[in-house]
């Protein structure tokens, strides 16, 4: 009878050679997917407008990860920052994709070799002649090598000592570029938005990993601990590895969703909390106040606001606005942003400035309400016109634009004022091209949302996997009904007297 599908991995349980083969093949698939996905994204990516149509609006998933590690140029002659490039070198987007695909091919061949030549002397215990692995020693080797890699990344790549550095930006995602990072060794290194912490933590964790690896290579575990934690069982390795992976997945889901120096706004889009807290709106207001204090007019002050900053202050870029099961990039939802119309200022007929109440994240529709500076409702778009007291028509609301494409233009006809009041609910007002991609007008999430959703789900799945395999290996004797140390004693015909090791029969 064949193995059921959920037990097929038992074929590599006591077969170290083929255990290596399947891991090589898995790594080949991961590397091959990464390279292929990068080439696909590069084929559909439009780099022409990094301000209003950045990578995260186009639904790019692997390009942002390459960019944050220092890859910014393409063999196609463009750069992520907008410049024209003549010589991108090997480590361009296409170069990184190609090296992943080449690595995938080499790993594929290595997997086949190890599957065919599975029975190596290296995997056999000299004393018993049976297949066995010195798992504590292998753990030490892996810990040492990963420590070297971790230290090297922090000390050389991130710092620019031998490498490009990483993507570093200001708190508002306006000035991002790749640059070397100085390690932060003080308390400031624990600030999740400080890129210096990335360098220092990799250096520190790498040194710790190297020391721990050398310790496990030179010191054998006590026999009681070895048996208690089932260190001789490969399923123990599986369980603890799953634990490491699910913990990492939970951590990166958090750093992605809440934001950090490792997940910059320019590469992954804003977080939902930046909309909820009016983060970009407050920065825009601060800049306007500063400009007005310098003697500039309101029109001049708004004209100084970067279009990039205004675009962040738009609800359509909030990753929590797109439903998890709405497939496609943000551009497939509200469309490709074409231009900022300017900041809309509403006034009633008495000259009082009115502010449109913004839509909260988890609303699809929201009443259009205009308040004065004291928070008192002065105008609205009523549901029942017969009972209205504050309608746009009754209050005599007008709108004037400052900055952007409609700078200095004003409207007073109620239909137009209502149109812009509805759009002002969504933050700064932009013009969108919905024809090119046949965009349906329904908001989509950004790669920040997809990454978080995927990693949180897999982390939960792997958490249960850790519990499952940990229980199996710790309580194997209970589940099987036989103490693993008594297997030979209950084997029929091995002893003249069952279970008496002093009466072992000799092989003829």
Curated annotation (Swiss-Prot):
**TM segment ranges:** 21-36, 101-115, 140-156, 203-218, 237-252, 457-472
Instruction: Determine if Membrane is one of this entry's keywords.
Output: yes
**Cofactor binding note from Swiss-Prot or TrEMBL:** Binds multiple chlorophylls. PSII binds additional chlorophylls, carotenoids and specific lipids.
Cell location: Plastid, Chloroplast thylakoid membrane
Q: An example Gene Ontology cellular component term from the record?
A: photosystem II
Q: Which residues form the signal peptide?
A: none
Q: Which GO terms describe its molecular function?
A: chlorophyll binding; electron transporter, transferring electrons within the cyclic electron transport pathway of photosynthesis activity
What's a single GO BP term from this record? Answer: photosynthetic electron transport in photosystem II
Q: Which InterPro entries match?
A: PS_antenna-like (IPR000932), PS_II_antenna-like_sf (IPR036001), PSII_PsbB (IPR017486)
Membrane topology of this protein: Multi-pass membrane protein
Instruction: Give the record's keywords alphabetically.
Output: Chlorophyll, Chloroplast, Chromophore, Membrane, Photosynthesis, Photosystem II, Plastid, Thylakoid, Transmembrane, Transmembrane helix
| UniProt subunit comment | PSII is composed of 1 copy each of membrane proteins PsbA, PsbB, PsbC, PsbD, PsbE, PsbF, PsbH, PsbI, PsbJ, PsbK, PsbL, PsbM, PsbT, PsbX, PsbY, PsbZ, Psb30/Ycf12, at least 3 peripheral proteins of the oxygen-evolving complex and a large number of cofactors. It forms dimeric complexes.
User: Which purpose does this protein serve, as stated in its record?
Assistant: One of the components of the core complex of photosystem II (PSII). It binds chlorophyll and helps catalyze the primary light-induced photochemical processes of PSII. PSII is a light-driven water:plastoquinone oxidoreductase, using light energy to abstract electrons from H(2)O, generating O(2) and a proton gradient subsequently used for ATP formation.
Q: Which family does it belong to?
A: Belongs to the PsbB/PsbC family. PsbB subfamily.
Q: What is this protein called?
A: Photosystem II CP47 reaction center protein
GN (gene name): psbB
